[in-house]
């Protein structure tokens, strides 16, 4: 039995290992990969490997894996990557897995600066990336430093602004909070909808020359072929949609494109190596095929996939709504519990105050009772003294009578009697004054005792009221062999049909232009970052982008502009560059 060969395939977020037979074809390996990860939109993808000369190459599906120039390592190493890009991610990418693989690949391109992204857009995209990873911002979970382990911005952007890690996190967090309620899958799609408007998104650049020998860039993407000047890969100067191209071929390093317009000359350019022309041919054929397919009704398979995706999305939205409803109920219950706890604490505090007031009133009552008893004793003493004085007065009166009688009986002398009489009269007068004084004191003590009694009755009434106040019930708790240098020529006819005239891509607008929310966010970020920007660190791409913005250009306005005039005029313009 033939010995099996170990293969390792790395996707954007996983590492897969297989054992294949020596006669296994590229397609058989590819099919095994897509089946393993559950991918059905296979037409965008391919298997990439590094050949024996160190060049990155796409695996041919119709040839055996072992017959291709794969480095003889164990295991054999491949990368599963997007080879072709959609025109519009929201219309073409159906499965969540497809969207996620594109998201991760595009994000990697932006962070590595293979796709130029202006600072404000980079921060906004970072916030969508954070939403797709962490879900809704939660201050209880996402504490300061929660983004410390994530690479979210291109190094160029970090170096161009005088902001530290914490300040970058604060800015990204603000926009992360803005996406509350957005599903992680929707955040991925929003990221791609903005990223696809970047000028370098989905473009394969190849160094080339025209007949004059001018150094230019040829850009191959989902919409056609574009020509760029050597120092500007953001702004194409001439464009040819796939619908204008009839045949593409190469002979050694010479690449020839025949337009559908018979009056137009061939579009000829020269590549530095034969292998580059082979790659260009393969990319042109694949992109043209997808361009034409998009302009026809969906196949039954695609219709079924879209229907299934809609159903799955609807189900997720239902589940999300249910979760949100449960979350709101839980939050309301927690708030109600907090309210009850708060009211309970307030009642306990009120009860404590009442108890203190009651205790204070009880003490005052005891003090007033003590004072009342003391006054009552003082009153009794004064009354006793008054009675004693009254008795002495009576005795004096009796003595006076006795003296009068004695004077009559004993016939005392008038002088002696007068003297005794005067003494007794004086004594009677003194006793009367003393009696009146004591009666006055007794009346005064009686009045004070009466006042204390009234205060005592008032305090008893207040205490009774405080003790009868209700305290409340206790609250309840709640997818041509590039290495084959012998095959020096190849040709491919690009079929066209009635749908070829559909150039709807020229009518597109950017996500920022049609989405007011995105436009508002980008404007705010531009203003916010301006103060921290170090103008001395601007790159050539930054300056080109700024000039395009000043002139009101964007990807689609530029596309309309570079396709103006007939095919012949644009080919003549290319030859004169």
Curated annotation (Swiss-Prot):
Tell me one Pfam family matched here: FERM_N
Phosphotyrosine found at: 116
| Sample GO molecular function, one term | cell adhesion molecule binding
Q: Which residues carry this modification: S-nitrosocysteine?
A: 117
- In this UniProt entry, the residues modified to Phosphothreonine are 558
Membrane topology per the record? Peripheral membrane protein
Main function: Probably involved in connections of major cytoskeletal structures to the plasma membrane. Plays a role in regulating the proliferation, migration, and adhesion of human lymphoid cells and participates in immunologic synapse formation.
Q: Protein name, please?
A: Moesin
């Amino acid at each position: 039995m033939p010995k099996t060969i170990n293969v390792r395939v790395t996707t954007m977020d996983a590492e897969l290992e297989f054992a294949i037979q020596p006669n296994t074809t590229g397609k058989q390996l590819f099919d095994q990969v897509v089946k393993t990860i559950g991918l059905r939109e296979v037409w965008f993808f391919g298997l990439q490997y590094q050949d024996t000369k160190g060049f990155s190459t796409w695996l041919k599906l119709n040839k055996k894996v072992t017959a291709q120039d794969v480095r003889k390592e164990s295991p054999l190493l491949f990368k599963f990557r997007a080879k072709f890009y959609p025109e519009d991610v929201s219309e073409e990418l159906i499965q969540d897995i497809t969207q996620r693989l594109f998201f991760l690949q595009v994000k990697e391109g932006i962070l590595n600066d293979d796709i130029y992204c202006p600072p404000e857009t980079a921060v906004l995209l970072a916030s969508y990336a954070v939403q797709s990873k962490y879900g809704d911002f939660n201050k209880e979970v996402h504490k300061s430093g929660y983004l410390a382990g994530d690479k979210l911005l291109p190094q160029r952007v970090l170096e161009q602004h005088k902001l530290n890690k914490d300040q970058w996190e604060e800015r990204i967090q603000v926009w992360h909070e803005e996406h509350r309620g957005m599903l992680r899958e929707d955040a991925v799609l929003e990221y791609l909808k903005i990223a696809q408007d970047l000028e370098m998104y989905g473009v394969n650049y190849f160094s080339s020359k025209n007949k004059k020998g001018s150094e230019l860039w040829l850009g191959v993407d989902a919409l056609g072929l574009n020509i760029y000047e050597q120092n500007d890969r953001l702004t194409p100067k001439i464009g040819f949609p796939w619908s204008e191209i009839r045949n593409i071929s190469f002979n050694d390093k010479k690449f020839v494109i025949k337009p559908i317009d018979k009056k137009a000359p061939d579009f000829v350019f020269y590549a530095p190596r034969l292998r580059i022309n082979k790659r260009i041919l393969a990319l042109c054929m694949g992109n043209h095929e997808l361009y034409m397919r998009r302009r026809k009704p969906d196949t039954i398979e695609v219709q079924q996939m879209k229907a299934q995706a809609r159903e799955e999305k609807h189900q997720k939205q239902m589940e999300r709504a249910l979760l949100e409803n449960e979350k709101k109920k839980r939050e309301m219950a927690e708030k109600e519990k907090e309210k009850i706890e708060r009211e309970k604490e307030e009642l306990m505090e009120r009860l404590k105050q009442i108890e203190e007031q009651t205790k204070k009133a009880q003490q005052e009552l005891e003090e007033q009772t003590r004072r009342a008893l003391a006054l009552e004793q003082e009153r009794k003493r004064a009354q006793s003294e008054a009675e004693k004085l009254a008795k002495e007065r009576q005795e004096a009166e009796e003595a006076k009578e006795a003296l009068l009688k004695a004077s009559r009986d004993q016939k005392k002398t008038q002088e002696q009697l007068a003297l005794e009489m005067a003494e007794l009269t004086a004594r009677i007068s003194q006793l009367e004054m003393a009696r009146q004084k004591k009666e006055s004191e007794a009346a005064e003590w009686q009045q004070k005792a009466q006042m204390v009694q009234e205060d005592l009755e008032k305090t008893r009434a207040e205490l009774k009221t405080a003790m009868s106040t209700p305290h409340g019930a206790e609250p309840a708790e709640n997818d041509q062999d590039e290495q084959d240098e012998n095959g020096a020529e190849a040709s491919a006819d690009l079929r066209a049909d009635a749908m070829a005239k559909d150039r709807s891509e020229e009518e597109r607008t950017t996500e920022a232009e049609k989405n007011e929310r995105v436009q508002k966010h980008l404007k705010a970020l531009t203003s916010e970052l301006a103060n921290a920007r170090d103008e001395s660190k601007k790159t050539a791409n930054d300056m080109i982008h700024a000039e395009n913005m000043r002139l009101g250009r964007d990807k689609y306005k530029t596309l309309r502009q570079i396709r103006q005039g007939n095919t012949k005029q644009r080919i003549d313009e290319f030859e004169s560059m």
